């Protein structure tokens, strides 16, 4: 801005100087002293001032003010989200389906014999299981006959009866008993021992009923048979169903358990 003003002033001064130089010179008239009038010479400086007063400076055009930067338009405001959509139309309640048509009685009739067939199958299975158990018990009794003989031998030795086997036969029966006990599965050992105990008790009871007074006393040293521990006390009452042990049968049961452990 300042430089522009200085340049303007210099231009004005230059124009004034050129105008001053170009002042017209008065034409010389013939020298006639009578006609000549004294002319007052105006100093150059006054002329310049006079000219300067006559010609006023042209009004300086104002410097065009810089146009202000156009105000930036504010960023477009984000339009708010559209209003939430209308809620989904509520689902119409399901219409209860019509129940399926009930089966006709023709289909319900064959169901009854099916249940009867199931009952029959269950009964057959139970019968088969009972038969298998009976067969197993018979096999176990046959296998454990040596054990029964061993127990009877111990009973005869303790009570001094005449039916005493030789030591070699006794040992052989004892070995067979142990072998058979080891061959029997653990789940069936208990039942097998029960069967042997009941067989021994029945055997002794039958003998006592048939020959109550025909027992002959025969004593033999007990040291020859160290395994002959305990005593056999047969009961006069008939045993109950097989598979249960009565209190009076516990000693015999313990004897066979000891044999199985050995």
Swiss-Prot record:
InterPro entries: Bifun_inhib/LTP/seed_sf, Bifunc_inhib/LTP/seed_store, Glia_glutenin. It holds the Pfam family Gliadin. Residues 1-20 form the signal peptide. Substrate of transglutaminase. Residues 232-251 have a biased composition (Polar residues). Belongs to the gliadin/glutenin family. Gliadin is the major seed storage protein in wheat. The alpha/beta-gliadins can be divided into 5 homology classes. Sequence divergence between the classes is due to single base substitutions and to duplications or deletions within or near direct repeats. There are more than a 100 copies of the gene for alpha/beta-gliadin per haploid genome. This is Alpha/beta-gliadin A-I. It comes from Triticum aestivum (Wheat).
